[in-house]
Amino acid sequence: MNAFLAAMVRHGQLADALQLFDSSCDRDIVSWNTLLAGFARHWCVQGWILWRRMVREVVGADGFSFSTVLSGFAASASLASGLQVHAQLVKSGFGDDVYVGNSLVEMYMKNKCLADGTRAFTEVRRRDVVSWTEMAAGYLHCGEPAKAIGVLSDMMLDGVMPNNFTFATAVNACANLTNLDEGRKVHGYVIRLGDDSDIGVKNALIDMYAKCGSVSCAYKVFQSMQQRQVISWTAMIMGFARNGRAREALEVFDDMLLKGIAPNYVTLICVLYACGQGGFVDEGWIYFNAMADKFGVEPVEDHYACMVDLLGRAGHIEEAEELISRMPFRPGVLVWQALLAGCHLHGNEAAGRRAAEHALALEKNDPSTYMLLSGMLAGRHNWEDARRARGLMTDTEVMKLPGSTWFQSTLDRNQACIG
């Protein structure tokens, strides 16, 4: 029965697997763990129901069971359920299992419980490379990139060699800090100790060098890759675009298409952004209009926001407003902020006020809208209204985010697909 169960789980036939499981009279711990692992891979409420059923039927969970269910709660960011399992773990006697300990660290860190995650890490007696990598990834996830980088040296002092996942995490932390010196150090470790051909590490290096302003180094890494994923091409396109080399970004995209690589929706966000940075209005329209028919990607709000930004930067405010009016769904905050940014740039106060009204009606606590509105009004020497806009920020207790823009929020939401 377990062999059939494993085959069903492997092929994603979870409903059939559960039916077979329920109809069987000779279930053992392997049966439970197999089904639990299947639900953990696509974690949903059924996984939690199965775990509670396992506890209720007094099935003796083992280390694999605890590790699996904790990883599931890490993936679903379900802290309350994870705490219940941790309490059961304490009574079980499997607390010393390194796999269970690693999953416990992962569960706390992905729920942004840094202190609890650190405590769980210190209680892992025989830490392996997964333990340290989970800790580095946890620090990064919790907004502590400097500590994530520090894990790399700490683990080597502890006699544990990093793997490619550790290196990629450390490189991403350097990118987060835009710390080129640390990024180069980590790259040196990769060359000496790791697999310099690993695609994931190289993707992270491209993103890091580009974010640190060393796009030539990013391109060298890109050129050295024997195999490239869509993420690789996307990271390089974005690297050129964000460093003022929009034409080269589009040349990379053209090369991507010539090699038969299909772009995804994030790639096309970066292509449209590159058009905006370069002022390539006609090309932007060509790419935007070809999205659905040629690339099989239906434009979403991020793509419309990029097109509005492109038109706004070029001073085509009326054309941008006309595009917004033709959107097949309700424009979101990003679209109106993109229009407001264009109005700020070209001093179109009337359209800018309209854009700000729409943006604030949708999200009154977004600092970007207030800053763009205030900047536009100040640029028109409308000091009183500019002060009033800043006063509204204070009245609504909006915190100014340094360097925050509508496009940065787009990148933040899609970062997993870029770097």
Where are these regions (language model features)?
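Terminal (and in a subset, N-terminal) low-complexity or junction segments at the ends
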Residues: 1-419
